[in-house]
Amino acid sequence: MIITRSPLRISLGGGGTDLPSYYREHTGFLVAAAIDKYVYITLHQTFIQELIVKYSKLERVATVDQLEHPIIREAMKAVGVGAPNLEITSMADIPGGTGLGSSGSFTTGLLKALHALKRNIVHPAELAEQACDIEQIGRAHV
């Protein structure tokens, strides 16, 4: 079993101001600080030949392409994880949509777990860049 824990953050910007779609067009800076609240991701290989994904919904599918959750689907594709015998669970200390960067924490934690499953060693800056790219792709599919 793989477990990741990613901190939530308080930012004096927020609302996507830390994403390339915003900062490439507008100048400025962002001040943020991690807090002691977290997003947890667990990955567990199972004996069931299906992909089980638990977040605010439950998905049971045969292939990655069948996943409804755009960030999970695109992260799995990006890392090259397609195993049908996998269970992914997401939990958080605070609900999403609170302005505490939960989508970024979720995405980085998920990518870290998927890379660990593949035994990939990824530099934190590369992980952050990949998470940013995945969030952009995920938002385009919503």
What kind of region is each of these model predictions?
Residues 140-142:
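Conserved small/polar residues in nucleotide/adenosyl-binding loops
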Residues 103:
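Phosphate-binding site recognition
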Residues 109:
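Active-site signature of alpha/beta-hydrolase-fold catalytic machinery across serine-
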Residues 123-127:
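FAD-binding glycine-rich core of flavoenzymes that anchor FAD
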Residues 1-100, 112-122, 133:
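ATP-binding N-lobe of GHMP and related small-molecule kinases
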Residues 128-135:
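Intrinsically disordered, low-complexity acidic/Ser/Thr-rich segments used as protein-protein interaction/activation
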